Amino acid sequence: MKLITISGPPSSGKTSVIIKLIEVLRESGIKKIGAVKFDCLTSFDHERYEEAGVPIVTGFSGKVCPDHFFISNINDAVKWGVQSGFDMLITESAGLCNRCSPHISEIPAVCVIDNLSGINTPRKIGPMLKFADCVVITKGDIVSQAEREVFKFNVRQVNTKAKIIFVNGITGQGAFMLAKYLKNAVDITDLSDMRLRFTTPASVCSYCTGETRIGEEFQNGMMKKMEFPTSHHDAAPGAAAETGGQKE
C-alpha cells in the first residue's frame, strides 16, 4: 500500500485537493483509496469523503498536541489501510502551530497552502513547508498573476527542492500533475523503522500536563522565556526580542 501525508494550515483547501486527487488517481488505475483525517476539535469533512465514496476515519486530538497525536496513531492508520486492502492511504492533518510537521522520511510529503493567506505566509509556516517533497498552492485563480509569482517565489525561498504545483480545488486543474507525481510512491506495510523528518514540540512543561494557573511558580519543566527591556526607552520601535520575540 502507498502512503501519502498531506498537511497544511486550516482552511487552505486540503480536503478539496485530496478529493480531486483521488478522482484522477482512480482514473489512472489506483482504485482502492482510503483516507485518515487528523484534526484538533471538530470536522465535517468526513461527509465530503463519504460522498466521494472514500472510506474515512477521523480522529480528534482534543487536549493532546496534534502532532503527538498524529505520530501516536499513524502506524495504526497504516495497519488499518493494509487490512482494508487499500492501494493507497492518504492522511490529512492541519499544521496548527507552524512549528510542527507530520512528514515521515521515505514517505511522500505534501504541504498545501493558499494564495489568500498572504504573500509572506510561506516564511511563517516552518518545517511543514520546509521539509515537504511537494508544495500545492491553492486559490491561485482569485489573485493576480503577480501575486501568484511572488507567493511562489517565497515558497521557493523556504524550500529550494520541493515540486510546486498549483491546484484548483473546485475545477481540479492541476490535480493530474499532482497525481502523476504521487502515483509511483513506494509500497509499505509498516512504519516501525521509519522516522519523522523533524522533531515534534517538547511537550514537557507543566501546561502540557494540564496546568492552567498563570505565574512563574506554576511554570515547571522546559520553558522558553523572552527578555523585555527595562523601560520603553531601551527598545527600538518594531524591534523583536532576541530571545524569542518575533517581529510581525
Regions found by a protein language model. Give the residues of each.
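Inter-motif core of Ras-like GTPase G domains
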Residues: 95-116, 124-133
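Short, well-ordered alpha-helix to beta-strand connector turns
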Residues: 53, 86, 106-107, 132, ...
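Nucleotide-state-sensitive switch-loop elements of NTP-binding domains
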Residues: 2-12, 16-104, 140, 173
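Short, glycine/polar-rich helix-capping loops at beta-to-alpha or helix-loop-helix junctions
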Residues: 42-46, 120-125, 147-154
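Canonical P-loop GTPase G-domain recognition
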Residues: 141-197
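P-loop NTP-binding site
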Residues: 2-16, 23-27, 189-248
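Short, surface-exposed amphipathic charged segments that create phosphate/polyanion-binding patches used
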Residues: 71-76, 176-186, 206-211
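Conserved beta-strand segments of the P-loop GTPase G domain that flank and frequently precede/overlap
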Residues: 37, 59, 92, 110-115, ...
